[in-house]
Structure formats: C-alpha cells, structure tokens
C-alpha cells in the first residue's frame, strides 16, 4: 500500500516542501529509506520503528520503502521522524489518508514515542501558509512558536500516541502549558547611564539615524563599549515584517527564547575576537547562520577590532555591501540576510595611550604593525571614524542629567521617517545606502557648499569614496536638523567624523 505525507525542511531561513512517500509491498522483510539523506535522517528509521513499537504498533514483515522527495536535494534535520511515522500508519491502514490531507507534519521522536522540538519551525509554518497550507501538526514545545504565524491552524502534541488518537478520532486537547507565557523582565541599558562623551554620543545618534557604520578609537575605559551596548536602544522599533525576519533566523538557530512572541527588540551581537569565520559569517556541517545574520536589523559590535584575525574581518566585506551572505559548502549553498549596523572599537595602540607620549611606550614600528592588522577595505566601509577621549573627573562625577535612550530614539525615528519618505520610490531606505550615481540627486550642494567641499577635497586629499561618505553623513546631519538642503555646517561636522585618519593611520585615505 502507498501513502504520501507533507513535511518541509530548512533552506536558509526559508522552508522547502518535502514529500514523504511510503510503499509497503510483498517481499523480503526490509526497511529502506532513500532520497539523498544525511546521517541523522537515515538514523530516523530506527527511532520511528522503536517509537511505533512502544506505542503498541509493529511494522509488517514486508518490504517497506520510504522516499523523501525531491531526491536531488540533501535532507538534513530530525523533523522527518513524525511525518515518516504518520506515512507508515497511513500505508498500514491505521489512519485514513484524508485525515492527513493538506497538513504539514514535523517533529523528532525519541525511542519512547515522545515528540521533541525541532529548529526552524517558524519559517516552516510561515512559508507553508504562503503556499496555501494552513494545517500543521508539531511537537508541543513548538506550538506557541508556530502560532505566531497568522492563518495557521496548529495542533501540538507531546507524544506519538496523542497524534495517532487525533488522526483516528479527530479529538484534540490543548497542552496544559500552551497558553502560558514566560514572565521575563530585564532592565535594558540606557544612554542616561553614560556620563560625558557628548561628541561620541552625537556621532552615535547620527550613525543610528542614517544607519552609518562607525569606528571608535580611544584609550581603555573611555566609554566605547558602554555606548555600543546601548546603540540598539536608540534604533526605531522593529516593524512586524522585521520581527518575523529576525525571529525566523533565531528559530533556525534554536535561539527563540520566548516562543510565545516574535522578537520585539533589535538584536545586539558582540562576538569575541577569537570567533571563527564560520562563527561570524555562518556555515558548519549543516550551514547555520552566523553572528552577522543574528545581528540582522540590529547591531553588530566588534570590540578590540585589531584582535580579530584578518581573514575573519574580510568576511564582512560582502555583507556590508549586499546586506546578505552567500554560503557554499559541499552539501549545498544557502543565503542568509545580514542587514546590520556595524560598530567597531579599538585602542589607539597596543598599550592604549597613543598619542600621549608621556604614557605610551609603543615604538613607531609597533604602531604601524598594530594598525596594519586592520584591512583597508574594511576601514573604507566605515562612514564615521570617531575618537573617544578619556572622560574627565568632572564629567564622571557630574549630576548625571543625561538624555535617555527614549529621547534620542524619538529623534532617530523622526529622522528615519524623513529618509523613508524621501526614498519611497527607491530600493534603499537610508542615507547610508544612497548609490554614488544618485548622490547629486539626493545630496545636492549649493555654490557655497561646493566651494567648501572643493577646499576640503584638496586639503585632506580625499578619495572619491571618502568624499561620497562625507556627503551621505552630511545628508543625515541635515535631516537631524530638519534642514531641506545640506549646509556648510553639516559638511563641517561630517568632515570631523573622518579626521582621525591622518592622526592614527597617516595615509588611511587611499
């Protein structure tokens, strides 16, 4: 007898439909599984056989063939256990085929027949609904995550026996804990906690307003990390579409901590400088998302930038330009989104006190080696390069009457709304994404402003790339002041955010 059941597998943060076919025919008693299977999928036949046995169901002494279609795509993951078991039950005549029609099954089985959660259930359900499938059967631990998708009729079960009962008589009892929500409360860091560093705070607001990448250079204890950790709190709230995109990525990684709601806060990722290329960009045997994808629609902070390996930092070049990462391995290729705001910090030298020669003991050669660790193309992709001086005693012990993150966020939201309206007919939505070909359209300069930039171009020996970055940042500065056109004062401030190149790199500008 033949049966067919719907399921799906992950392809990046999307779901690919898979058909589980079972044929039971006369012949030597054998249980074969075909369809380009990974080891964990192939091992599933023993989990399924034993789980059915412990539910009181014995497989017939016949030739059993299980095919996972399409056969040209490698199947990975443990979510095929449940659909294989259901397909066997249908083929054995224990469940009517119409009970499983237009339903997607997914779940892992243990030997006792208990259903275990699987990664990536959110994109599986979301893409299933897009394809017109609205009924899903999943493990109970994945139930709330599945119900985040509108239009999905999801049933969650904790054991295979419960699934069999549901398919045979249609009875469904909601798991006892399905309606409960975790009570999670935690205090978010706030900009009001940062004393001093007004120049650095201003640069951070501009970076957030235009989604400009920023590098901070300063001695230890200057507040670079404190400001970076609070950067996500001044970005606009995630839209519903962005919440779903970010939640899909975290679901694929099994990191959706509270499965009763989509992620509400913008991600903040700060990998250690020993992170591998696969850890940063993604990859591994099963091609998982890396830190740059986990920071999608949020902030990626690289503390102590020169301590990262040069090969690891080079991985950032493509995502910074294309806002996505293409990963290719022997088992296949996937694309993960990676549209993030990059923040990086570093000391000015190995000891941290250059150019203060009273405290710095680094030689000129060691200084050169220190800055040579950083890729020039990566530096070129930083829109703002800001110096963070030491905080004075007066600033540190002041009354602490600092602006809160909410106050700054309100200004950032207003600034970004101006950009979204301006670029409503374009494929980009922030000033940092203005292509060079459209700078004259969106960053038009008056005669006085042109004369100023011509003077700065020759005085600072600017490259075309740096000149364009200054215009984009100046456009954001003008937006923060609600100015229709770029003014000389906007250009002057934008130039200041590129002025540390000569101080620390000398010939940083190409």
Functional labels for PLM-detected ranges:
Residues 18-24, 280, 383-386:
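Short beta-strand elements
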Residues 297, 303-304, 315:
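Walker B catalytic acidic pair
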Residues 205, 262, 267, 278-300, ...:
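Conserved alpha-helical scaffold flanking the Walker A/P-loop in AAA+ ATPase domains
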Residues 242-276, 283-284, 389, 429-438, ...:
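Conserved inter-motif catalytic segment of the P-loop NTP-binding fold
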Residues 216-257:
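Walker A/P-loop
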Residues 37-45, 60, 67-77, 287, ...:
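Basic, amphipathic alpha-helical bundle interface domains used for macromolecular binding and assembly
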Residues 112, 302-309, 352:
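Catalytic P-loop NTPase motifs of RecA-like helicase/translocase cores
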Residues 1-215, 219-225, 328, 466-467, ...:
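Peripheral, non-AAA+ core regions of ATP-driven protein-machinery
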